[in-house]
């Protein structure tokens, strides 16, 4: 099994991005699966262009995109990506699309095809906080998740794809009082646990357990 893992470069005034720093620490194989990690720019269309190149060349069995969600307290596999860009801030090249479809020929939304409930359970078993997230936002993270599912559907129809948000690193919250953070080793360990679940559930259905929200 081959798994492509992506991480964004820093954005929004941050000097580092825990997504990129964490995936650099991943081992070459996890639970027998070959791991390839790539850096993607926090730029709407360019992120998808880079991803497409690697999907076509690597032909992964699964794609796991990782992104920073400052303020979240744990690792959060995303349930759904919507076909809409609505950027509160510009991306790293100044693009700020508002109410713009990501793909004119795409579905209104794509659900993650990764075993998100099993991923949460595996992260919990590693002793780390995690939960299913029901919104990936409307910035580049949602954009890339949507593009990943669209591109996999087009170029690797048997592959799975999805996205997971992670908290700030400790170094990022020194000047952000009362903001949740996690040390880099734990973030990496949580990503490894999630990937272990992706491999473990490659030929079976996801766990059926509560992961919803009331609001």
UniProtKB/Swiss-Prot annotation:
<dbReference type="InterPro" id="IPR000816">
    <property type="entry name" value="Peptidase_C15"/>
</dbReference>
<keyword id="KW-0645">Protease</keyword>
<feature type="active site">
    <location>
        <position position="78"/>
    </location>
</feature>
<dbReference type="InterPro" id="IPR036440">
    <property type="entry name" value="Peptidase_C15-like_sf"/>
</dbReference>
<dbReference type="GO" id="GO:0005829">
    <property type="term" value="C:cytosol"/>
</dbReference>
<dbReference type="InterPro" id="IPR033694">
    <property type="entry name" value="PGPEP1_Cys_AS"/>
</dbReference>
<dbReference type="InterPro" id="IPR029762">
    <property type="entry name" value="PGP-I_bact-type"/>
</dbReference>
<comment type="function">
    <text>Removes 5-oxoproline from various penultimate amino acid residues except L-proline.</text>
</comment>
<dbReference type="GO" id="GO:0006508">
    <property type="term" value="P:proteolysis"/>
</dbReference>
<feature type="active site">
    <location>
        <position position="141"/>
    </location>
</feature>
<dbReference type="Pfam" id="PF01470">
    <property type="entry name" value="Peptidase_C15"/>
</dbReference>
<protein>
    <recommendedName>
        <fullName>Pyrrolidone-carboxylate peptidase</fullName>
        <ecNumber>3.4.19.3</ecNumber>
    </recommendedName>
</protein>
<dbReference type="InterPro" id="IPR016125">
    <property type="entry name" value="Peptidase_C15-like"/>
</dbReference>
<dbReference type="InterPro" id="IPR033693">
    <property type="entry name" value="PGPEP1_Glu_AS"/>
</dbReference>
<keyword id="KW-0378">Hydrolase</keyword>
<comment type="subunit">
    <text>Homotetramer.</text>
</comment>
<keyword id="KW-0963">Cytoplasm</keyword>
<feature type="active site">
    <location>
        <position position="165"/>
    </location>
</feature>
<keyword id="KW-0788">Thiol protease</keyword>
<comment type="similarity">
    <text>Belongs to the peptidase C15 family.</text>
</comment>
<dbReference type="GO" id="GO:0016920">
    <property type="term" value="F:pyroglutamyl-peptidase activity"/>
</dbReference>
